[in-house]
Amino acid sequence: MRKQLLLGLGLVSALLVSVQASAQKFEQLAKTPQMGWNSWNTFGCNVDEKMIRAMADAMVTSGMKAAGYEYINIDDCWHGERDKNGFIQADKKHFPSGMKALADYVHAKGLKLGIYSDAGNTTCAGRPGSRGHEYQDALTYASWGIDYVKYDWCDTQDINPKSAYATMRDAIHKAGRPMLFSICEWGDNQPWEWAQDVGHSWRTTGDIYPCWNCEHNHGSWSSFGVLPILDKQAGLRKYAGPGHWNDMDMMEVGNGMTEEEDRAHFSLWAFMASPLIAGNDLRNMSDTTRAILTHKETIAINQDKLGIQAMKWIDEGDLEIYIKPLEKGHYAVLFLNRADDAMDYRFDWSFHYMKDDISKHEIFFDKQAFNWRNIWNGETGSTKEVLNIKVPAHGVVVLRLSPR
């Protein structure tokens, strides 16, 4: 035991003294937005190894793995105490088999295991944070077989965010195991301006709440519905791309909104090239929820290799139109109805022109024709004809355009 302890401490010391100025994240990860599941939205602190194993099982049997989801992420409250040498331990009551055994189980399913920590002394739920233990924790995670680290921002009043996140990035890289690094700084310090070389994604807002258009006051902080989070993405699309994504938070599909709201929520997250991290109970979700979360054509828009975040193309108040360039000259177009009533909408393509200064795409619809397919109901048509659609209240119509 003593020999193993000295070896472990020696490895940590070696990591600390060998940090290079060119330290980097693992560049081969998140070339498209990551897809997975996270425990927080539904379970909060009520997590244990039995439930996590069941979620891994459900991700496979529900068809979510086949649809592209791969990460099973444990959020806050898995932590026990640090041992006398500062190494973090899993809560032995709720994770009696240990994290290595849990990771082995998840890996045997063809999935990956994610874990949570915090840049401060304590996590948001008061468990041990990683401040001052970054290299120890990264080495521990690597030894457990962890594949994903979500790094939160509680208890950080006197910490520089860029430095704090860079330190954990360096620690993960030095630990030697590729781990996706998810920055959860809530957008308070504009991580999009400095985090491209630090993490694979960064949160752009505070926490999500399962509502269409609300701000939920928790006292000292607020959480936000679908539309407020969408609106906070204005001006951020230029920062997104393969390996570095604007993260709009875990999804609330299946957690109490209407079917149309869930479909719109999922479609918008896909268009904005946000990570698609489910936040519902995978074990008992409805067929409708499963159909939304595994919708092949929507996921294809999110996972398009160009990695271009959609732009708001046209704004007519309650009716907004988003467009996203895709591979092979294709485009995805989303009509969003923010209002409480359904809307009949007439759209003459020939009157419209699209120019995207960021991705350098442009379309003259009076000169270039596309065939379109409504990805949610299968209807087809052409941009040579006037489009007449009914956009549901709190809903979307999504078309995929392909060159004629």
Curated annotation (Swiss-Prot):
Notes on temperature effects: Optimum temperature is 50 degrees Celsius. Displays half maximal activity in 25 minutes and 7 minutes when pre-incubated at 50 degrees Celsius and 55 degrees Celsius, respectively.
Keywords annotated in UniProt: Disulfide bond, Glycosidase, Hydrolase, Signal
Record GO terms (molecular function): alpha-galactosidase activity
Catalytic residues identified in the record: D152 (nucleophile), D207 (proton donor)
Top class in the EC scheme: hydrolase
Substrates-to-products reaction catalysed: Hydrolysis of terminal, non-reducing alpha-D-galactose residues in alpha-D-galactosides, including galactose oligosaccharides, galactomannans and galactolipids
Pfam families in UniProt: Melibiase_2 (PF16499), Melibiase_C (PF17801)
GO BP terms in the entry: galactomannan catabolic process
Disulphide bridges, residue numbers: C45-C77, C124-C154
InterPro entries: Aldolase_TIM, Glyco_hydro_27, Glyco_hydro_27/36_CS, Glyco_hydro_b, Glycoside_hydrolase_SF, Melibiase_C
EC number: 3.2.1.22
Signal peptide: 1-23
Keyword Metal-binding: no
Binding-site list for substrate: E185, W186, G187, D188, N189
pH dependence: Optimum pH is 8.2.
Protein function: Hydrolyzes galactomannan found in plant cell wall, by cleaving alpha-1,6-D-galactose side-chains from the mannan backbone. Appears to act in synergy with mannanase (ManA) to elicit hydrolysis of galactomannan. Has greater activity against galactomannans with decreased degree of polymerisation values. To a lesser extent, is also able to degrade other galactosides containing alpha-1,6-linked D-galactose, such as melibiose and stachyose.
Family (UniProt): Belongs to the glycosyl hydrolase 27 family.
Record-given protein name: Alpha-galactosidase A
Organism name: Cellvibrio japonicus (strain Ueda107) (Pseudomonas fluorescens subsp. cellulosa)
